[in-house]
């Protein structure tokens, strides 16, 4: 869904890929594909990767879930790992982390730091992981300051630096003095630094 150099989610996956390549060298072959939309194109790319002989395929975005399940049925000898999903199959597993725990702690810090009692949250898409994060952040903030209000602006995209920056500026305009984000670029941080 975004380029490997976007400084966020995809970058972290790419760092892990490079570490695996460094450890195993020519014992493994790694294929990467960037900027795959969460639509029928994902299904095409997954199928191509399986047809090329890849035995383990990482689908690194929630929106790939149904495409992974469909292609996995066609290639029972290929293993698929799907990020942040919740559906599985004999050859499909999910991987994730407890992101909400860190977001709760970030909320506590934000709640203790704000002067306006208005916190901003730039969010990509209303999927379970993002909603958990918003809720955890809000609960963390309200645990130290019950007067906190968290305002959310949705970008409807994981990676759109322009929309992310505009969302941050909108929240600043609404009085938010601490802003966090669940998107893939550093545009929110840059917009806040410029304000």
Regions found by a protein language model. Give the residues of each.
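Periplasmic-binding protein-like
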Residues: 53-61, 81-83, 174-185
